[in-house]
Every structure is written in C-alpha cells, then in structure tokens.
Amino acid sequence: RTSKIIYKPLGTVGIIPAWNYSFSIPLGEVVMSLMAGNVVILKPSELTPFIGLKIGEIFERVNLPTDVLQVVTGDGRTGASLVDSGIEKIMFTGSVATGKRIAESAAKHLTSVVLELGGKDPMIVFADANLELAAQGAIWGAFCNSGQSCSSVERLNVEESIAEEFTKLIVEKTKRLNQDSGDKETTDVAAMSSERQIKIVEDHVESFRREGAKILTGGKRNENFKGAFYEPTVISNATNEMRGMREETFGPTLPIATFKTEDEAVRLANDSDFGLTASVWTRNLSKGKRVAEKILAGTVCVNEVLYTHGIGQTPWGGFKQSGYGRTHGKYGLLELVAPQHIHVNHFLLAPNAWWMPYSSNAVETFRGFAKHFASGSLRQTVKLMPQLLKRIKELRSK
C-alpha cells in the first residue's frame, strides 16, 4: 500500500490589500496565487486604485491568459461583494475591524481567509545592546514610510539603567531627520497618506499628553508644508496602560517605556492585543534568541527590525488580533492549495481482515491484535498470524 499527497489549486482567490504598500504586498500575493494554479481577483484599496490597475497591466504584458487575473476597483462595498461571492479564498490586509467583518461574511460560505491585521510592535533594548545601532534601528523602524507599516516600531521598551542615555540619543537623531516631499530622494520622512490617518496620530499624541507622557520632539504637524505632514515624534514616560501604547497608531511616533528585568521586558512585549512582529536588541545573542522565543509574535528579530516582510522565503503573519494565516514561502503557498491524499492498495489477492461479515474468530483476532500489537509485543503479535490467515480464508469463502 502506498500513500501520496498532491496539491490542487483552490480555484479563485480574492486579494484585498491595504493602501500603505499598495504595490509590493498585492503583487507578491498575486504571484503566489498564480504559482499555486489559482485564478485571482484583485480589489485594490479605494485610496490606491491606479496601482492595482498597474499590476493588472504588468501581467497583461506577460500574456497571462484572459481573466486569470482580474482587477476590480471600488470601495468597501465592492470588497464586501467579493467576500460574499462564495469564492474559495480571501487574502486581506487591513484593520482589525474590517478583518473581523470579512471573516464573519466569509464563514457563511465556508470561504477560508488569510488576515493580516496590523500590530503594535515592541522593540526591546537591553543595557548590553549596541546603543548607536539600536538607536538607528529604532528611528528607521518607527519613521520609515512615515510610520505607516504594519511592522513599524510602535512601542520602544528600554532597560531602565540606559533609558536616559538612549532616549537622548534617539531625540538627537530624530531632530536630524529631513522631512520633505516624498518625490525627493533625500527625504527621510514624507507626508502621511491621508487626512484621516494624520488625525488618528494627532489623537494618540494628545492622549499621551493627557495621560502624563512627555513629548520630547515633534508632536505636531509640520507647518512648513501643506498636506498631511506630521513631525517625527519621540515620547517618553510612556506606560503600557496608556491608550497610545495599546491601539495601533500607524504614524511617525516613537513612545518610550522602561523595564528593569528580562521577565518584565517579555511581559510588557506580550501585554498587547497584537502579535505581528517584535525585535530584541542585545550583544548577547543567546539571550536575544531566548527572549525572542518568549514573545508572542509572528516574526521576532534580534538586532534587526521592520524589513523582514521582504524575506520571501519566510512566513508572514501574526498572532492574536494581528490575524491568522500566512503569506510568503512554503507556508504561504500551502494557504493557496488544497492537499489531496491518494492511497493505493497494490495487493489484490485477498480482502482485508476487518471487512464484514464478522464472526467469533474475527472478534478473537481483533482483540488479540488490539492487546498485543498496540502494547508493542512483537512476539505475541506474530503468534496471531495463523489466526489472521484463518480470518482471511473465512472471508474469501463468503
């Protein structure tokens, strides 16, 4: 007898990406879905429809068969119709609230979903870290793409003994950042995506002020520019109880809290509804890996931050309210296929002993095998072979 597993395409995959990385995220998911043999419907964010259409144009140039990839534009109602259409898979990147609605709607059709719903990602800096390197990493992790990344550093937890020195270093480096138009190659921090998003940032920063945190730099719109330009903002005296440390901000803010022990650092990192990514900074790599394995997040870096979405071989996804399912690599491909087990009986000379009809000899044989085979007694099991052959002969005579 032999068994093998083959993988079949699911059928139609619906991809609903967010607006923040509106080219790279859906492009990768489209490629993986097509590689797995599926057809794809891409519904780009209503804020970035032309990028979705551009992805469709790219695949037209490679002579993809007609309608294997379709791009449909529209707002949330279009996305809701896609989810409710009964297709085989939905891959969604976006907010927790929308992700829950998608999961509820998809469940009516038993449509499986992959949900990547953002994070509140912690960065832990121990006293033995390379502080210069960690400071540069924190600034890039917090302010890249104006903080509009699901894996942005949104909570900076620093060991108490170095907190003052490290915070000073962060503030100095933040003040040197160049904020300007995004079409200039030397710009460090550009505008945010929308007025709606900058208002969320303003709301969170004001909540930090009300709850006793200190704004060390930034904390307001950049008045030198028109549009949604918010200054890179560093906040000290933050605690995990503050609203701005619990809700996803998705903007250029870097709130700093402190810890005293390794256990407290882990507890603070895990004290969140989210679990997408995290990072640990220390010269002691054994400690770094030990702490990383205790953190409840889909990806944990040691002395690195933010960029791992670009490692195509590794799974991407989160725990808790950050969603479920994975994209990228082996585990991402397995989300896009249905495993089928093929089993073949090559021995065609006799029936199976457990087939009907049953007899007293059959009952005695089954009890003997259950007792001796399951207990690991090979000698006693072998002694049952004559009885087993008798049972097979009994069936062949029926």
Task: Mark where each language-model region is.
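Structural detector of well-ordered beta-strand residues that form the stable sheet scaffold
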Residues: L34, I41, Q70, M91, ...
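ALDH superfamily catalytic-core signature
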Residues: A97-T239, V302, Q387
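Short glycine-enriched loop/turn motifs at secondary-structure junctions
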Residues: V83-D84, L117-G118, C150-S151, E185-T186, ...
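Conserved C-terminal structural/oligomerization subdomain of aldehyde/semialdehyde dehydrogenase
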Residues: R210, N222, F229-K398
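Rossmann-like NAD(P) dinucleotide-binding subdomain of oxidoreductase/dehydrogenase enzymes
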Residues: R1-L133, M385
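Short helix-capping segments at alpha-helix termini
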Residues: R61-P65, L177, S181, M242
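Residue-level signal for inorganic ion chemistry
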Residues: G37, L69, I90, G119, ...
